[in-house]
Curated annotation (Swiss-Prot):
One of its GO terms (molecular function) is metal ion binding. An intermediate of this reaction is the autophosphorylated ppk in which a phosphate is covalently linked to a histidine residue through a N-P bond. Catalyzes the reversible transfer of the terminal phosphate of ATP to form a long-chain polyphosphate (polyP). ATP binds at N55, Y482, R578, H606. Keywords: ATP-binding, Kinase, Magnesium, Metal-binding, Nucleotide-binding, Phosphoprotein, Transferase. The keyword Nucleotide-binding applies. InterPro entries: PP_kinase, PP_kinase_C_1, PP_kinase_middle, PP_kinase_middle_dom_sf, PPK_C_dom2, PPK_N_dom, PPK_N_dom_sf. Its cofactor is Mg(2+). Its EC number is 2.7.4.1. One of its GO terms (biological process) is polyphosphate biosynthetic process. This is Polyphosphate kinase. It is an enzyme of class 2 (transferase). The gene is ppk. It comes from Bacillus anthracis.
Length: 702
């Protein structure tokens, strides 16, 4: 229904918004649900526990750390949506994080581990070992572990050491019987569990069974060999998460690469934001000391009933997956893209028609070939590309280096400020420069998050430009795991736009003219605000307003308010938001025409797609940008239209299939809570599985 003027609602009311941090925790809870879901293969459930832990580590290192910094600085202003102060946010985060970690450990200990045991995969403690296994593990400790360990004594001359971020440590309380005075008899030693050693040590076992013991269990059992002459009183396991957000002062920075390299060294030693302690064998005296030394409070301390740092379960997954194929997802192989058919030459096909790529259902290899073939083609004069996150052994990097070595003009923007990929990107920037590429580090005070490649070719005396645009990174590894779109075109206007875009990045150009591209921080928000306004106008005139928007996160208040206006005008809005969503749907007179769903499953939903009905003249945009304030204001992003009618129909069908998912979809209610979509006896639709089946069918039909 559309509101009358006398019925105006205050769209700034905090009751209409979810807090960003709490909404993110709700997303990670959906990841944890995948570990609890018994329809998922057992080892995949193990992997989801690992992903949950890894996500939470980063959340504490960045988001919680930032809130703590605000509190320390005396900043107590409420955030602009849900109206929570930093202190209130920290309190609510602590309650929810404790609850989620308790559920995580309960899932691991009470469900996943027993199920693994039924398959012959069993965790043993030192006390469970047979005589043969004890002999094996003692020899293993003496030869493989002991030489790597550094026992650190704590006393007046050797203060409590600075312990690495995310490191697992053993606090060993020792008793010295030789001391006369009782107060001098208790000593403390710290042993850091080396991250370079295998966390899971597999033991001699009968038959097809795989029994293992954890590295920290082994070290704990032999601490007397590290502190000879003392009696081991207790061994307490603990792990510290530190503030790891980089502070980069770009003003006056002559060499951004050196500034970032310097800051990276500090990341290991930031203030403690979380302390995890193993419940088993915990010593209250050690715990009291850790509180004091690390300056943590009760809400920062997580006493867990199980092994600390469950990110390690990913390495266990990788070890066991090849041996237990029935416990992992059935293999699904990315198919040849339907827009390429049997064509060998991507460039000649792009001259015929635009090419749409849908990963991981369709192979990422044509994107690699696009750069590799350009490097090998003697007619290619220049290659320009933005890189945000790439794989550890990137074929695209290798192709760019070859192109430069062959004398082509190669310009690469390597975003040095890509969080937790800074070190990797510094390495690639140096390597590309050494190969002869012109490397630029981005735009001051902005992260270049756009995904674009331009190839310039001279053939038969004519200059041709080919452009690849994407919603995801140029990363051949994650392209097998993330859902994303790629688009290759030889349209002249797109080529001109790409040239202008790269000139903006590399020079002193102010906002250039674009035919089709919208670029943040210039005008992406304005573009989408205008498109929503148009949809409102069309709905008032024709009654058929309809918007579908798919993204990773939705936090931008101006865009949220604009969608509330669309809902109030009667426009139907369907949002597919995998992660954080600050918008609340279903609120009478505010958002009753908005539906919000989140799909969390085998593949990480990563594509950004924006659909507007436009009174039948449908408009579809793909983008590198989510509807987040940082994407609108603090990043260089690209949004681009799909012009081909068949391509638009294909993307719309994919959106509709995703909205019909009733297996991996959770829907948000007006209170901000998420619930599984009820199947109600209809056909089960897992959109990701169905998209893979469609890709296979397209290949078979060719």
């Amino acid at each position: 229904m559309e509101l009358s003027k006398g019925n105006i609602v205050n769209l700034n009311d905090t009751a209409y918004y979810n807090n960003r941090e709490l909404s993110w925790l709700a997303f990670n809870e959906r990841v944890l649900q995948e570990a609890q879901d018994e329809t998922n293969p057992l080892l995949e459930r193990l992997k989801f526990i690992s992903i949950f832990s890894s996500n939470l580590d980063e959340f504490f290192m960045v988001r919680v750390a930032g809130l703590k910094d605000q509190v320390s600085a005396g900043f107590n202003q409420p955030e602009n949506k849900a109206g929570l102060t930093p202190k209130k946010q920290l309190n609510k985060i602590a309650i929810k994080a404790h609850e989620l970690m308790t559920v995580q450990y309960g899932t691991f200990k009470n469900y996943v581990l027993p199920a693994l045991e039924l398959e012959g995969i069993e965790r043993l403690t030192f006390h469970d070992l047979t005589k043969e296994q004890r002999e094996f593990i003692e020899e293993y400790f003496d030869e493989q572990i002991f030489p790597v360990l550094t026992p650190v004594a704590i006393d007046a001359y050797r203060p409590f050491p600075m312990l690495l971020n995310k490191s697992l440590n053993l606090a060993t309380l020792l008793y010295d019987e030789k001391q006369v005075e009782e107060e001098n008899r208790t000593k403390l030693g710290i042993v850091q569990v080396p991250s370079l050693l295998e966390r899971f040590i597999f033991l001699p076992s009968e038959g097809q069974k795989h029994k293992f013991i954890l590295l920290e269990d082994v070290i704990s059992s032999f601490t007397h060999k590290l502190f000879t002459g003392y009696k081991v009183s207790s061994v307490t396991r603990f792990r510290i998460t530190r503030n790891a957000d980089l502070t980069i002062h770009e003003e006056g920075a002559r060499d951004l690469l050196k500034v970032i390299e310097k800051e990276l060294k500090k990341r290991k030693w930031g203030a403690a934001v979380r302390l995890e302690v193993g419940k088993e064998h915990i010593d209250e005296r050690v715990l009291a000391l850790l509180y004091e030394v690390l300056e943590v409070k009760d809400e920062d301390v997580y006493i867990m009933d199980g092994p600390l740092d469950l990110t390690c379960l990913f390495s266990l997954y990788k070890k066991l997956a090849p041996l237990y194929e029935h416990l992992v997802y059935p293999a699904l192989i990315p198919q040849r893209p339907q827009d390429l058919g049997d064509a060998e030459d991507v460039f000649e096909k792009a001259i015929e028609h635009d090419i749409l790529l849908h990963h991981p259902f369709e192979s990422f290899q044509p994107v690699v070939d696009f750069v590799r073939d350009a490097a090998d083609d003697p007619n290619v004069l220049a290659i320009k590309q933005t890189l945000y996150r790439v794989s550890g052994d990137s074929p695209i990097i290798q192709a760019l280096k070859i192109a430069a070595e062959k004398g082509k003009q190669v310009t690469v923007l390597v975003e040095l400020k890509a969080r937790f990929d800074e070190e990797n990107n510094v390495h690639w920037a140096k390597e590309l420069e050494q190969a002869g590429c012109h490397v630029i580090y981005g735009v001051s005070h902005l992260k270049t998050h756009s995904k674009i490649t331009l190839v310039v070719r001279r053939k038969n005396g004519k200059i041709e430009r080919f452009v690849h645009l994407g919603t995801g990174n140029y990363n051949d590894a994650t392209a097998k795991l993330y859902t994303d779109f790629g688009y290759i075109t030889s349209r002249k206007d797109f080529g001109v736009d790409a040239t202008n875009f790269f000139n903006y990045l590399s020079g002193y150009t102010t906002k250039p003219h674009f035919h089709h591209l919208s670029v943040a921080p210039f005008d992406i928000r304005e573009q989408f605000m205008d498109l929503i306004d148009e949809e409102i106008r069309y709905h008032r005139q024709y009654g058929n307003g309809y918007i579908i928007a798919k993204m990773n996160s939705l936090t931008d208040k101006p865009l949220i308010k604009k969608m509330y206006e669309a809902s109030q005008a009667g426009v139907k809005v369907e949002l597919i938001v995998r992660g954080t969503c600050c918008l609340r749907p279903g609120i009478p007179n505010v958002s009753e025409n908005i539906r919000v769903v989140s799909v969390v499953g085998r593949y990480l939903e990563h594509s950004r797609i924006y659909y507007f009905h436009h009174n039948g003249e449908e408009k579809i945009y793909l983008s590198s940008a989510d509807w987040m304030t940082r994407n609108m204001e603090k990043r260089v992003e690209i949004s681009f239209p799909i012009l081909d009618i068949e391509m638009k129909a294909r993307i719309k069908a994919i959106l509709q299939l995703t909205l019909a998912d009733n297996v991996k979809t959770r829907e948000q209610n007006k209170d901000g809570d998420y619930y599984y979509v009820i199947n109600s006896g209809a056909e089960e639709i897992d959109s990701q599985v169905k998209l893979f089946k469609m890709a296979y069918q397209n290949t078979d039909a060719e």
